[in-house]
Amino acid sequence: MSEVMTIGEPMVNLIADSSETYLEARTLPRQMAGAEFNVAIGVNRQGHSISYVTTLGNDWQGDLILDYMNGIGIDTSNIRRMDGAPTGYQLKVRSSDGEPKVIYFRTGSAASQTTPDIVDNIDFTGVQILHVTGIFSALTPNTYDTVTRLVQEAKKHDVTVLFDPNPRPTLWPSQEAMIDATNKLAALSDVFMPGLEEGQLFSGLREPRDIANYYLNMGVKKVIIKLGDAGSVLFERAENGERMETVVPSFMVSVVDTVGAGDGFASGVITSLLEGLDNEHLLERANAVGAIQVTSVSDSEGLPTAEELEKFIAFTPRKEISL
């Protein structure tokens, strides 16, 4: 079985070859997309095994995704196929400010119809880390219940649960519902990994240390806060209860497209945990993967191999950071 497991909605990504508008595009090269899919690709590229849990439609998009996963070695044994619901896809066009324009075609998708019984036949043998996000949780009440059940089952098997909230407010009936649901999942997690603004939203607090205390007091073991392009900070409690923190700056790069940076960061955290890196080197690797990813227009094609990551860390200058 794989070392890592994730659950989410993989999509086909059609990228316009123009820089500002779909109308100017002459071709739409297809690649892969979806936050959890990006993480799976990142973990795979760094030399670790990962299994994907989802539902795909019996259509060309589903065939493409399954073929891609099988081709690079992502375990697909926990993927269902279904008739009557499409596999999601998206259209993306680059923007000069690094924030691309994206149109989603995912309403009523097969993934959104995933139900908790998909967990029944999952074998957790060998799985060390479960990665979940707030995106798949937000699709429907069933997907939220599926994620919750998967987390609960994983914990029964002593699997470390890493939760990236990755909020999508438009998928929730209200902000209050999103905050409540997110914090319930955070309380079940071992590693909670929000961006600073996300942590502020979900905790109602402003300062990173206060946000960390809020989640450490819930029982979260590690709180990792992403500080945008500046870097990141990790908080945890020592055996005596004292809060410990590690702050690591990011790298100097030219930004092409910011999509996938957080997913790349997550893949770096996951592989670092698998390899037993200390907190400083964990954040260094995670920052590096995120920095490399923003230099590529694709959501995942820029994600590095372990060798590429090592060279980037060795030769790329750092920024300065302070809390």
What residue spans do the PLM features occupy?
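Active-site metal-binding loops of divalent metal-dependent hydrolases
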Residues: 10, 135, 165, 264
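Conserved N-terminal subdomain of the carbohydrate kinase-like
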Residues: 49-134, 311-323
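Short beta-strand/loop segments at the ligand-binding rim of alpha/beta enzyme cores
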Residues: 158-165
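Conserved phosphate-binding/catalytic region of the ribokinase-like
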Residues: 1-5, 152, 208-323
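Conserved phosphate/ATP/ADP-binding segment of small-molecule kinases
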Residues: 157, 169-244
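Glycine-rich phosphate/adenosyl-contacting loop at the front of the ribokinase-like
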Residues: 1-74, 300, 320-323
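Anion (oxyanion) recognition and catalysis
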Residues: 44, 70, 148, 152-156, ...
